[in-house]
Amino acid sequence: MHQLYYNAARKAIYMTGKAITTNAPSTSNGTTVGSSLQATAFKNMSTQEFVNAVGPIAREDYRKTGVLASVTLAQAINESGWGKSGLTQSSNNMFGMKTSLSGNSWSGSAWDGKSYAEVKTTEEYNGKKVIITAKFRKYSSVAQSIADHSAYLSNAMNGTHRRYNGLTTTKSYSTQLSILQKGGYCTWSGYVSELTTLIKKYNLTSWDN
């Protein structure tokens, strides 16, 4: 099972479990391209097929939010294991978004506020790994997951300041990745390097045009 490295609250999450209970998802809205795409479609896709399926959604989202499509794609690849992780397959959750993030005080969330999947995960606290059951957001489509993730990156607060301030005003993927790292998105030191490699290897910047 793919390991997902994600930091929603300044702690690393290593997700290897699968959903054990779920609530029904809401209907997706606000995204037209690929709005009905389900993560189950990724199960037998090649890497290029995955990029071709998610790319148009990421590009449209970039035009709306300023979060580069290349960054969205690289994060989705890294955090969902090319869409094949247990959480992604069961819940269309491409980024390991928990039900509670930054106090849920940020605007523009595409999540319905109630649909979730309970997943067993291994989290790291002060260098020690523990297994817990956590609640993760469940989405009606891949597009809804991407929209919610971009809203979080655009509007999440850290006190009185935006957690990822300046992210949506730069068109440099390296700068966006640096802002994510500085904002505490992921505590794994190799995160930016890993995403940079994915962007270059699969020519993900082509979706930023």
Where are these regions (language model features)?
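Catalytic cores of secreted/periplasmic lytic hydrolases that degrade extracellular macromolecules
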Residues: 2-209
